[in-house]
Amino acid sequence: RRTATFSKRKKIFLVSTPTIKGLSNIEREFELSDKRYYLVPCPYCGGFQRLEWSQIRAEDNNALYECIHCGKLIGEHYKTQMLANGHWQPTAPSDGLTAGFHLSSLYSPVGWLSWKECVDIYEKTKKNPSLTHGFRNTILGETYEAESDAPEWQRLYEKRETYPIGTIPMGGLFLTAGVDI
């Protein structure tokens, strides 16, 4: 109710780092928005694109960005120019009231967190997978989804057995049940 005074002129900002997929409050709010991403132009071909982790290339103790349009490798020294000439692009229908913005650390200005530093942090996750969660959340600005080795529900269903209600199977000491939804 703090913004009620401002009626239609109010602006509410929800700013956060995403956490666990399906549980993250900021992910839920972003999904309800028009999902804007910042597109930057390639300094070689001018094609606009999101800065995506999949396009980072580590070479000779350096990190470069491969353009999705022309395939040329872009040095980080072009980033200032790219950021200055970029624009926000909505990717979902808008309700006219809610704008959502996603920006990863790959957009950090020159002199801040570099692409090479992002690669170095990523390399540490290969040696210590427990760091993957933090890398996805804080560097990529994405939710983390843990890999699971749980069997498919059909495999569990095939193992079921039928017993009359009120009976415990022979050899059973106690009966317990659990459900994870």
Where does each model-flagged region fall?
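Short, flexible loop motifs at catalytic/binding sites
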Residues: 1-181
